[in-house]
Amino acid sequence: AFLWAQMEAADEINTRRIALWNRYNSAFEKFESQGKLRRPIVPERCDHNAHMYYILLPNLKKRTGFMDYLKSQGVGSVFHYVPLHSAPAAQKFSRYHGVMDITDQYSERLVRLPLWVGLDSDVDMVIAKVSDTLSYLDNDC
């Protein structure tokens, strides 16, 4: 029943999430032009459902500092994934395990920011805290 109610409101939910995603994307454009982060790339003629918003920071040290400082400011963020090839089960079950430079690099740099349909009233605060955090990192890392 709960999921059915969400399905019935899917268009409204997606519209609101996309609006929040676009707010992030616009707000962080200046930081991308300064080389502080990279924003998501959505190819032309493609749509997305805004299920998450991520940024790529220059390296693991910056990502760790970013997440720690953002948390100290009351905003949670998470890294996205541990690459499957580096998981313990990969040693046992995978056809490949070992070094995958590009995959490892992205997993060390990617940060997911808060994004859910009820974020409307807090999105400006999150943007401000991310901006403050990036400024802090310029001085600290």
Where do the language-model regions lie?
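PLP-dependent aminotransferase class I/II
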Residues: A1-C141
